Amino acid sequence: MSSWLIYALLSAVCAALVAIFGKIGLQNLDANTATAIRAVIMALFLVGVVVAQGKLALVGEVVANKKAMLFIVLSGVAGALSWLFYFVALKNGNVAQVAPIDKLSVVFAVVLAVILLGEKISLMAGAGVALISVGALLVALG
């Protein structure tokens, strides 16, 4: 099995746990405050990973790359907005409805990759994107 597939599957399992743990943790709490606390925990955890890997010295290299930093900042803002919207949706909706709609990000990512990055997708991949769209809506609305 390819390493990218293993990491993608691990990511999917962890994302599922985010939905379950988030829904349980949000009971009677403000979603935005909980999201901010989650972000701090994630930041501390990730800094710990970088330190444990001995890569703290690479931070300066990343920060010095202006173009990379612009897109890392934009990615961070988009990610923060995604988390805020996701936790508000989880607080107010059912995991079985919110999680599939959230996964429409796959569809949006593919469409944006084609439009903005010039990536090419096969007819089979296009059919898969359509099936993901329909499947997410069927699960969420069914």
Description of each model-found segment:
Residues 12, 16, 20, 47, ...:
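Hydrophobic/small/kink-forming positions within alpha-helical transmembrane segments
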Residues 1-13, 29, 43-72, 83-92, ...:
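Membrane-interface interhelical linkers
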Residues 53-54, 117-118, 142:
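Short helix-capping/hinge motifs at transmembrane helix termini and TM-loop junctions
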Residues 6, 10-13, 37-41, 70, ...:
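Hydrophobic residues within alpha-helical transmembrane segments
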Residues 46, 124-141:
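Hydrophobic transmembrane alpha-helices of multi-pass small-molecule transport proteins
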